[in-house]
Amino acid sequence: MPIATPEVYAEMLGQAKQNSYAFPAINCTSSETVNAAIKGFADAGSDGIIQFSTGGAEFGSGLGVKDMVTGAVALAEFTHVIAAKYPVNVALHTDHCPKDKLDSYVRPLLAISAQRVSKGGNPLFQSHMWDGSAVPIDENLAIAQELLKAAAAAKIILEIEIGVVGGEEDGVANEINEKLYTSPEDFEKTIEALGAGEHGKYLLAATFGNVHGVYKPGNVKLRPDILAQGQQVAAAKLGLPADAKPFDFVFHGGSGSLKSEIEEALRYGVVKMNVDTDTQYAFTRPIAGHMFTNYDGVLKVDGEVGVKKVYDPRSYLKKAEASMSQRVVQACNDLHCAGKSLTH
């Protein structure tokens, strides 16, 4: 299918929330990882989200360019072409963008999509993330208001983060402590600043103990009840029934989470879960195995010439793609979106 239109993307998220499932958002950095993600979605019979971080986008532009916008556009255009050959919907998103990179990443990408929409087309991306977790909440939400207006004009959904996700991603490290839980006051301020969709649709990455990186199951102290509290605060603020779920939540830092915690988060309105660390390992593991198994073929040892068919990058990248695709299928199963593509 062609990349999801704004209307299809909104329907994807709406169905997920209504039926208590979520979509994996797979961080990609190359054509190989994009191929792996889309194949995984298709194998699972699920729609899905592909996203590029600032570092991933820069990597995607190559060592000679090293430009985030160039890489994001190139990877997005590639995804548009490949996704059209598959029978599921794929949406494009950009991951964490801090304040110091807004002018060199999200704002230029918003401008590109706005230009496309002004000519009667669809945006290049379906959503962008503004990560204001490093600045005071009032400044975070003031910037979010400005970006939400620009995003809505370009038919794009904005993702924001309130609270801090622990661990490390793209070289940005955050401590793991009691600050990793979004407060009721911050949920209320979010509703006051951004509303409940009337100023533009947004996704909320609230923090409930999330940690980026690699952790053994059980070592991440998640409190999904924080999300339930957030929904209750928002419902009360908006005068809605107590069981209403005004927020569309995003689950960051899911590696090492227990399945029971994921299940609970889904009940409280999570519609998108970021997956990066686990798919990175799934991609790299068969490459490592290939190198160990064929070390005397991939290396020119003791004056020998090696074996071309095993140092041909295709020989191990195919294995990497297949392994990562399998991990994407697992993510779809864990989030209960498998078999639920809107195309079915």
Curated annotation (Swiss-Prot):
Catalytic center residues: D95
Pathway the protein contributes to: Carbohydrate degradation; glycolysis; D-glyceraldehyde 3-phosphate and glycerone phosphate from D-glucose: step 4/4
Cofactor details (free text): Binds 2 Zn(2+) ions per subunit. One is catalytic and the other provides a structural contribution.
Residue spans crossing the bilayer: none
GO biological process per UniProt: glycolytic process
Domain of life: Bacteria
Residues engaged in binding dihydroxyacetone phosphate: G213, G253, G254, S255, N274, V275, D276, T277
Positions bound to D-glyceraldehyde 3-phosphate: S53
Binding-site positions, Zn(2+) 1: H96, H212, H252
NCBIfam families for this protein: cbbA (TIGR00167), FruBisAldo_II_A (TIGR01520), PRK09197.1 (NF006628)
Family note: Belongs to the class II fructose-bisphosphate aldolase family.
Function text: Catalyzes the aldol condensation of dihydroxyacetone phosphate (DHAP or glycerone-phosphate) with glyceraldehyde 3-phosphate (G3P) to form fructose 1,6-bisphosphate (FBP) in gluconeogenesis and the reverse reaction in glycolysis.
Miscellaneous section: Was identified as a high-confidence drug target.
Entry protein name: Fructose-bisphosphate aldolase
